Amino acid sequence: MIGDWRVQQVARVVRAGGVIAYPTEAVWGVGCDPWDEDAVLRLLALKERPVEKGLILIADTVEQFDFLLDDLPERWLDRLSGTWPGPNTWLVPHRGRLPEWITGRHDSVALRVTDHPLVKRLCALTGPLVSTSANPAGRPAARSRLRVEQYFPQQLDAVFNGALGGRRNPSVIRDLRSGEVIRPA
């Protein structure tokens, strides 16, 4: 088990504007503080990902997303009920409450409450994190720390070692408004 000191150390890196890699439910992810524009733009540059595409935010509890979920129609909240924590990412209207470097050209943002124990502990200390697969655009997502280090040699501020969550595929992505599956699991 990863010690609390290591979780705290990686959380300090995130709060200081660092870009980190960490295991998720299915693949390795890279992330940073979503409120730190410089960190997000650096992460996007590492991945060669255009800002217009938008990013996923992960959290350890639904409450970390309350500022985005309050005032939503009850039928939408019913769709979320029972799907978090877990491998379910929802496109939620952001209503101008998030910066464009997170949302890209979209009127919604992708949100997931993780069930990965290590990432939950990290998000408990940092708040929500940007979470995107650890790979340059067009390359397969990293499934090992070695592959992360090959993709991003000496470009990350911390690599939070741990085991993947055992899922075969990244999370399903659904639109909260329609319930439509955007990306199957």
Curated annotation (Swiss-Prot):
GO BP: any one term: regulation of translational fidelity
Intrachain disulfide bonds: none
Keywords in alphabetical order: ATP-binding, Cytoplasm, Nucleotide-binding, Nucleotidyltransferase, Transferase, tRNA processing
Catalytic activity of the protein: L-threonine + hydrogencarbonate + ATP = L-threonylcarbamoyladenylate + diphosphate + H2O
Localization per record: Cytoplasm
Main location: cytoplasm
GO molecular function, one term: ATP binding
Protein name: Threonylcarbamoyl-AMP synthase
Organism of this sequence: Stutzerimonas stutzeri (strain A1501) (Pseudomonas stutzeri)
